[in-house]
Amino acid sequence: CTLFAPYEGEESFEELNTNEDVQKYFKKIFPDLVPLIPDLCEQFFSNPTSSMAIMRTYPWHVDDKSILIGDAAHATVPFYGQGMNAGFEDCRILDELLDKHNNNFKTCFKEYSQVRKPNGDGVQDLSMHNFIVMRDKTADIKFLLQKKIEQKFAQQYPEKWVPLYSMVSFSNIPYSEAWQVGMKQEKMMQSIMNISNINETWDSEEIMEKMLGLI
């Protein structure tokens, strides 16, 4: 498993210096995990603590001389599992642009920077959003109910609702577009979740009709 925690402050890596510190921390934060890892302290201190970062830069090219691709252009945190895919997509788009512009590097590289920058930002936004979801919401009853409603609506009206995860992972929809659509969906779902008796009526056609009316 991987531990994500701040470097400094309360309950941070800087406080985990001895076996006693580690045992105390894990018993407090992850009590059900401790019995499953008898060599917890040994594993903790034998694995390096490393940082995660998001890097945003522009432009991604220098005339017709060089371009940035993948992590060199849009390094991101790993919480959507899309870093390598985004890099491969850079390559696909670059290849398409080389064909489009008959290998005119200067024109191609300029357009590459313009069209890929929003999607580099998009995959970073998606990654940070998913971190918050995994950290705060996966055990939240209301959030889980929201996902049930979304799933039912997507099954009934697949042409009107594609879940954000599906847009990102199983289509060629640009990251920036998926992010924008996902945020519109989230805003719509907040209206649905604010219905006073949603816990009782979530599985009804009435709710499905209300969602249709919001699209």
What are these model-derived regions, one by one?
Residues 1-54, 101-103:
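Conserved FAD/dinucleotide-binding core of flavoprotein oxidoreductases
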Residues 6-10, 74-75, 130:
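A short, flexible beta-alpha/helix-coil linker loop
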Residues 22, 26, 90, 116-119:
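Hydrophobic/aromatic residues within well-ordered alpha-helical segments
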Residues 50-68, 121, 139, 143:
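FAD-binding beta-loop-beta segment adjacent to the flavin cofactor pocket
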Residues 51-57, 73-85, 118:
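Glycine-rich phosphate/pyrophosphate-binding beta-alpha loops
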Residues 69-71, 89:
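Active-site flanking residues adjacent to catalytic metal/cofactor-binding acidic residues
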Residues 80-97:
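A short alpha/beta connector and helix-capping loop motif
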Residues 96-215:
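C-terminal helical "tail/cap" subdomain of flavin- and related membrane-associated enzymes
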